[in-house]
Design a protein with these regions (language model features):
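Conserved small-residue
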Residues: 1-167
Length: 167
C-alpha cells in the first residue's frame, strides 16, 4: 500500500484520485502525518529543500520502515496486526462494506426508508486499497453517536482545512 508512494526518479505522485472526496482528504491527511514523522526539518533551509524536492532518499527509506504498520492482510500465515483493525474477535453480524462511509444510512434509516439522498447498495464491493482508505477515513472522521462507530480521534466530524502555499 505504501509502496505506491515510491516512484521512479522524476515521476512522483502529485495527487490522490479516489472516486470520493472524503478518501482524497483522508489520504492527504495521512500523507501529511507520515511526512511529519519521516521528515523533521530543523529550520527554514531544511523546509525549503524539502519543498523543492531535494532529499527524497530519506523518504523512501522511511516509507519502507513504516510499511509493516500498513499491512492489510497480516503476516504470511494471515495472522498479526492489520492496518486500522482490532485484533479482538469480531462479534455480531457483519455489515455491508458501504457502512465504512459515514454518509451511508444506518439500519434505522433504511428501515424507515429515509435514505432518499444517499442511496443504499451504492458500493457492493471495494478493492483492498479502497477498503483500507475507507476504514481509515471512517476512523479519522467518525462523528459521535449514530451507527455504533466510535468517535474519531479528533472528537467527531470531518471539518478540515488544508492549505497549499504558493511557491
Amino acid at each position: 500500500c505504501l509502496s505506491g508512494l515510491l516512484a521512479e526518479e522524476g515521476d512522483y505522485p502529485v495527487a490522490f484520485d479516489w472516486p470520493r472526496g472524503d478518501l482524497n482528504v483522508a489520504s492527504a491527511e495521512l500523507a501529511i502525518g507520515l511526512l511529519t514523522l519521516l521528515h523533521k526539518p530543523a529550520g527554514e533551509d531544511d523546509w525549503r529543500a524539502l519543498w523543492e524536492g531535494r532529499g527524497e532518499g530519506d523518504l523512501a527509506a522511511g516509507i519502507e520502515r513504516l510499511a509493516p504498520f500498513f499491512n492489510l492482510l497480516g503476516d504470511e500465515a494471515g495472522e498479526g496486526p492489520r492496518f486500522c483493525q482490532d485484533l479482538d474477535e469480531l462479534a455480531g453480524t457483519p455489515n455491508p462494506v458501504e457502512a465504512l462511509f459515514i454518509d451511508t444510512p444506518g439500519a434505522n434509516g433504511q428501515k424507515k426508508n429515509s435514505d432518499l439522498l444517499t442511496h443504499r447498495n451504492r458500493f457492493p464491493a471495494l478493492g483492498l486499497e479502497a477498503a483500507a482508505m475507507a476504514l481509515y477515513a471512517l476512523q479519522q472522521f467518525a462523528p459521535s453517536g449514530g451507527a455504533g462507530n466510535r468517535t474519531s480521534m479528533r472528537g467527531g466530524g470531518p471539518m478540515t482545512t488544508l492549505v497549499v502555499p504558493n511557491a
